[in-house]
Amino acid sequence: MIPGEYVLRPEPVTANAGRDAIELSVTNTGDRPVQVGSHFHFAEANAALDFDRAAARGRRLDIPAGTAARFEPGDSRSVRLIELAGSREVFGLSNAVNGKLDGGPHPGVPATERGAK
């Protein structure tokens, strides 16, 4: 082995295998492009994006880590969302959750009160 050498398996690695996924239609109703990162809690995405936010709660984009989806003004397309894993706690972002996603009260500001469609 050469120092620093990587020895990889010949089989391909499948990201997010076995994770529950849904497809949602998303439309950018705004006048500016919107980008959403790979691990952003999708339900809290920019208010100009029109989609079923209740269905997106606790989910993120099913895209490679470190990448983003870009929605141009008037752009409408389908996205695949998977469940957030780990402790399932969300803090900051748009202040809609600020705590655990599962169980307990949800003290954050509802998306509709932040101007979301």
UniProtKB/Swiss-Prot annotation:
Keyword Cytoplasm appears in the UniProt entry: yes
Residue ranges of coiled coil: none
A single GO molecular function term of this UniProt record: urease activity
GO BP term, pick one: urea catabolic process
EC number: 3.5.1.5
Gene Ontology CC annotations of this record: urease complex
Pathway: Nitrogen metabolism; urea degradation; CO(2) and NH(3) from urea (urease route): step 1/1
EC class (word): hydrolase
Spans annotated as Disordered: 95-117
InterPro entries according to UniProt: Urease_beta-like, Urease_betasu_sf, Urease_subunit
Keywords: Cytoplasm, Hydrolase
One protein family per Pfam: Urease_beta
Reaction catalyzed: urea + 2 H2O + H(+) = hydrogencarbonate + 2 NH4(+)
Places the protein is found: Cytoplasm
Keyword Transit peptide in record: no
Family, per entry: Belongs to the urease beta subunit family.
Subunit relationships: Heterotrimer of UreA (gamma), UreB (beta) and UreC (alpha) subunits. Three heterotrimers associate to form the active enzyme.
Annotated NCBIfam families: PRK13203.1, urease_beta
Name recorded for this polypeptide: Urease subunit beta
Lineage, opening ranks: Bacteria, Bacillati, Actinomycetota, Actinomycetes, Micrococcales
